[in-house]
Amino acid sequence: MRFAIAAAFGLLAGGCSKGDNAPPVATVSFSASKARVPLGAPIDLTYKFNVAPNAAISGDYRVFVHVVDDNGNPIAWNDDHDPKPPTSQWKPGQTIEYTRTVFVPVTPYVGDATVEVGLYKGNDRLTLMGPDGSDKTATARAYKVGTIHLLPPSESIFLIKKSGWHPAEFGADNPGTEWQWSQKTAVLAFKNPRRDITFYLEFDARTDVFSDHPQQVTVYSGSQIVESFAADNGGAVLKRIPVTAAQLGDAEQAELRIEVDRTFVPSKQPAGGKDVRELGLRVYHAYVEAR
């Protein structure tokens, strides 16, 4: 199920008093792959910009995407990002469209959440003409473009990290970023939905450690190989792995096993250190979705 609401972008010509009078430089559409999504689940967000015939944007602006609750209070979730291509390369009449997959953070709030979009560079924001008439005089230039209904995490298939996982870690400069390192073999267990599923695995690999050739990753359901790939990405990458109901088997509990052909111990690397753990992949998200 998809929804889309269009808005128009205007170039910021100066301070905003009772309204923004700058001409729109583009029309933006926002859509989500799901109108209702559990906390912790992945969702595809699509942004489409139809650049106006006489538009001119000076420099590179970032897109901010903030989510607020039904009282207008911010939820600890945003999708701020650099558009591709950057705004300095946008041409009059051009259509810019791209999709980003994000995982909804687990927050205390459930219910309707409003998505607000803007375009900014430092303290400068471009004017938007959104679908909500009241936004025409919004001095914050954050424009309401859609609504997503957030469901409790219990609506998702609950995953148990059964074995082969190190404790969770957090980014020192970004506490919202969490990961767990796997060992050579890591097992996830969950109640068998007896349906086809998609297994989402977001991870990165130490390509600097395995510079001769990348680690080989194999995902099993029982004794069956459901996916095999090279971990040749230095940054985070998301794999969507289809698994059939037949591959999950008939048992009440299903398991997915992630194996790497090689591991490393940080303390044995040239940089040294005190970390003596056996590390495989750094996993940011693991999620099972019934199809």
Region spans (language model):
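Sec-dependent bacterial lipoprotein signal peptides
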Residues: M1-G14
